[in-house]
A protein has these predicted regions:
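Short, Gly/Ser/Thr-enriched beta-strand-loop segments that form substrate-interacting elements
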Residues: 179-187
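Active-site-proximal beta-strand elements of phosphoester/diester hydrolases
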Residues: 201-205
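A glycine-rich beta-turn/hairpin centered on an aromatic-Pro dipeptide
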Residues: 165-169, 173
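Active-site glycine-centered loops adjacent to acidic/histidine catalytic or metal-binding residues
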Residues: 108, 168, 207
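N-terminal beta1-alpha1 cap of cysteine-dependent amidohydrolase-like domains
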Residues: 1-105, 116-117, 123, 127-141, ...
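Active-site loop->helix "elbow" adjoining a glycine-rich segment at hydrolase catalytic centers
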Residues: 109-111, 118
Length: 254
């Protein structure tokens, strides 16, 4: 880890919300670790939590259970666990983050949810559709991903071809409004999306939190934290507006 930011001081007052399930997993702890490595404080947001999003400087939508297909006009086609309460929470968080122009990073389910939020849809099971890629899950970066060089992700990864892991069985199908595809795998399944205007918004289909030993995947978090800091500085000069979702962010919600 030649670019290790271990010694980087914490950004004063920079708080990133991490939306996740009721119980944190290793993935969520690694996301927390990655954000703290780059100086951010974190607040874990469970389904149904009341959070004043205006007190956050950035939002991460983490991985987890499948988004209920009713969110994109379909009925369940696979046997899966759903968390409708979390779906509802993520809609509220994304809506308010969009209003406030707060940077958002979606990981796996989070990337899919961003696409659904923007009116897109999912393929509920890509496994039988794979031709040039492996069917089994890959925790190590053994999946080839092609990145659009002229994109935010391309700037972060610094290479048009990267290795990534794969722990998903669904994929983005119809692309949501004002989004662009910035990475695909060898079967052309979407691996990353970005906003085409305004708000810093990125969705990553793989799990970079498991690949922090790799500089490129680590930079995804550092660029996100930098975007949150930049937006915070701008917001300090803006008038404060109360939102309908205003609740609280615990001072020690790590």
């Amino acid at each position: 880890m030649s670019e290790s930011p271990v010694d980087k001081p914490e950004h004063p007052g920079l708080t990133i919300g991490i939306s996740g399930p009721a119980r944190r997993s290793l993935a969520h702890r690694l996301i927390t670790f990655a954000l703290r490595l780059h100086g951010a404080r974190t607040h874990f947001i469970r389904p149904g939590s009341k959070v004043d999003v205006s007190l956050l400087d950035g939002l991460v939508l983490s991985g987890g259970t499948h988004v209920h297909p009713s969110r994109y006009g379909q009925t369940p086609q696979v046997t899966a666990r759903y968390d409708v309460r979390r779906d509802e929470t993520d809609v509220r968080l994304l809506s308010r983050a969009e209003e406030l122009n707060i940077p958002v990073l979606g990981i796996c389910r989070g990337a899919q949810f961003i696409n659904i939020f923007r009116g897109g849809s999912l393929c509920q099971n890509v496994t039988p559709l794979r031709v040039n890629t492996r069917h089994r899950p890959l925790l190590l970066p053994l999946q080839t991903v092609r990145v659009v060089s002229d994109s935010r992700l391309g700037e972060v990864m610094r290479s048009p071809v990267i290795g990534a892991n794969r722990i998903h069985s669904q994929s983005i199908k119809k692309l949501g409004t004002h989004l662009r595809v910035v990475a695909v795998d060898n079967d052309s399944f979407v691996q990353a999306i970005e906003n085409t205007r305004g708000q810093w918004l990125m969705g990553i289909q793989w799990h970079p939190e498991y690949l922090l030993y790799h500089g490129g995947h680590r930079r995804i978090f550092s660029h996100f934290v930098q975007a949150a800091e930049d937006r915070k500085l701008v917001r300090l000069d803006e008038p404060v507006e109360a939102g309908e979702d205003d609740g609280y962010v615990a001072q020690n919600g790590r």
